[in-house]
């Protein structure tokens, strides 16, 4: 009987895996933004007033379930569950459901960051969650679910990251490790995810996926309901799954164990793009970007310049604090035809534990904007930088076209076309790029969407005239505000 059940699980996993790679975007939209720690009401408004009109495809939201309350309210308290009640500092279940509906109505899908690996870590006394639920993490007692000690793996510490048992059955940074092979645990996780599906979400980012056995996740994913047709999804549509698997290429638990279950976060993309645009690797080598660099196949890779974790670490990863290089890297990310793209929207931080912007009562505050639409009160909002949202529009305009006419100067100046719909040039040298280059575009004058916008037929920034052969004179000065230029057919003057 066990062999039959296992075979059935594997069969279901195989038949559903391709469906779980589909993010269910509207039209030609194809970029996700992570609105890290935003409130549900603010996300709903952002969908209606900015993300929808600018062509964003979806939002990754912070964990929605009740979490532990930690002193100072660090961002990581959201990653320490107390129960699966939908009450956090971002809002309650009613506000969450309202956000999902309003975002779906304007073509912006919602993907929830979900915690299936663990509950909260030890607490000195009885812990209280954001919905008022009490728990005793040290005893592995979580009445709000309920979970008891029998629902967890035995307590042990990860000391050897090359030991599969430790990685998948011991406690990640002291967080109480759930036993996903347990029928009861599986039922509660499936119930939680199905509730979110009923509310209209399009899928899930699965936190700490490498710390769970892939066969257990296959069972859980395969047991989920189809997406809710009342929110515009077709019949039999499966939730989009993207899984956090940190794999630097030498891990005992490999990304390849998860890639057929759904997309996988391609951390090597983030690391290598940071090295390149920091000047530690010549941009000319990016011509073979993607699988040529040993990355996952394009439909299985969730790609990003930085995320909420690695932007807080030392190393090559670029973040908002290096804006010129960050914008160049993001432009390349969104222009090059590889991966399922996600852009980051951060809040300012000075140390690893900095909480999101909050008031004196420790309530998350709403972002405020200046006359140009940029955030001003502790929220960084990279997605509102013109150079980034303009590239979201570029990516929409060139969707389903191939890369062609790669050019480089043998160093850190590059350009390429996307079919006959788009052209990108980057200068990361300390001298000017001044060159007649093939843009592949039809003859005409085009607005550079990096330096300006096309408004009422006029360009507020640079413009490039393309001749009948598709060539245009491209100039990016070494001291220009931005080291990138982007043209596309929807920005023709």
From Swiss-Prot:
Annotated Gene Ontology cellular component terms: extracellular region
Pfam families: Alpha-amylase, Alpha-amylase_C
Sites of Pyrrolidone carboxylic acid modification: 20
Keyword Disulfide bond: yes
Cofactor(s) annotated in UniProt: Ca(2+); chloride
Record InterPro entries: A-amylase/branching_C (IPR006048), A-amylase_C (IPR031319), Alpha_amylase (IPR006046), Glyco_hydro_13_cat_dom (IPR006047), Glyco_hydro_b (IPR013780), Glycoside_hydrolase_SF (IPR017853)
Keywords for the protein's UniProt record, in alphabetical order: Calcium, Carbohydrate metabolism, Chloride, Disulfide bond, Glycosidase, Hydrolase, Metal-binding, Pyrrolidone carboxylic acid, Secreted, Signal
Cellular compartments annotated: Secreted
Catalytic activity reported: Endohydrolysis of (1->4)-alpha-D-glucosidic linkages in polysaccharides containing three or more (1->4)-alpha-linked D-glucose units
Disulfide bridge map: 47-103, 156-170, 375-381, 417-440, 447-459
Signal peptide residue numbers: 1-19
Chief localisation class: secreted
One GO-annotated biological process of the protein: carbohydrate metabolic process
SMART domains in alphabetical order: Aamy, Aamy_C
Name used for this protein in its record: Alpha-amylase-related protein
Native source species: Drosophila takahashii
């Amino acid at each position: 009987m066990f062999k039959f059940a296992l075979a059935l699980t594997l069969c279901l996993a195989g038949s559903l895996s391709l469906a779980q790679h589909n993010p269910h975007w509207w039209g030609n939209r194809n970029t996700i933004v992570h609105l890290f720690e935003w409130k549900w009401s603010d996300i709903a408004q952002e969908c209606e007033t900015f993300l929808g009109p600018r062509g964003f495809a979806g939002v990754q939201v912070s964990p929605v379930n009740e979490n532990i309350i930690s002193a100072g309210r660090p961002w990581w308290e959201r990653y320490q569950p107390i129960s699966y009640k939908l009450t956090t500092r971002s809002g309650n279940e009613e506000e969450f459901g309202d956000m999902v509906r309003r975002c779906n109505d304007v073509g912006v899908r919602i993907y929830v960051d979900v915690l299936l690996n663990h509950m909260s870590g030890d607490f000195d006394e009885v812990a209280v969650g954001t919905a008022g639920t009490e728990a005793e993490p040290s005893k592995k007692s979580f009445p709000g679910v309920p979970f008891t000690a029998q629902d967890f793996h035995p307590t042990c510490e990860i000391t050897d990251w090359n030991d599969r048992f430790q990685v998948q059955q011991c406690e990640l940074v002291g967080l109480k490790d759930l036993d996903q092979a347990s029928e009861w645990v599986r039922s509660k996780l499936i119930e939680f995810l199905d509730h979110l599906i009923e509310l209209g979400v399009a899928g899930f980012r699965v936190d700490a996926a490498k710390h769970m056995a892939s066969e257990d996740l296959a069972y859980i994913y395969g047991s989920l309901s189809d997406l809710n047709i009342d929110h515009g999804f077709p019949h039999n549509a499966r939730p989009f799954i993207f899984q956090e698997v940190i794999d630097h290429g030498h891990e005992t638990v490999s990304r390849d164990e998860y890639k057929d279950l759904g997309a996988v976060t391609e951390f090597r993309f983030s690391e290598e793009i940071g090295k390149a645009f920091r000047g530690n690797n010549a941009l000319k080598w990016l011509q073979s970007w993607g699988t040529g660099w040993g990355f996952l196949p394009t439909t299985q890779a969730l790609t990003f310049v930085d995320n909420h974790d690695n932007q807080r670490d030392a190393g090559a990863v670029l973040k908002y604090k290096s804006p010129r290089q960050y914008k160049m890297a993001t432009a390349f990310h969104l222009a090059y035809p590889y991966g399922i793209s996600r852009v980051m929207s951060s809040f300012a931080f000075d140390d690893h534990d900095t909480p999101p912007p909050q008031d004196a009562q420790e309530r998350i505050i709403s972002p405020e904007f200046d006359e140009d639409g940029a955030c001003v009160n502790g929220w960084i909002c990279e997605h509102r930088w013109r150079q980034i949202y303009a590239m979201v529009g570029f990516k929409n305009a060139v969707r389903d076209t191939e890369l062609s006419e790669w050019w480089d100067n043998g160093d850190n100046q590059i350009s390429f076309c996307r079919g006959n719909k788009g052209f990108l040039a980057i200068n990361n040298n300390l001298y000017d790029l001044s060159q007649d280059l093939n843009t592949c575009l039809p003859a005409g004058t085009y607005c550079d969407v990096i330096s300006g916008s096309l408004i009422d037929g006029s360009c507020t920034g640079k413009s490039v005239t393309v001749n009948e052969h598709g060539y245009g004179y491209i100039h990016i000065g070494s001291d220009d505000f931005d080291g990138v230029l982007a043209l596309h057919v929807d920005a023709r003057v």
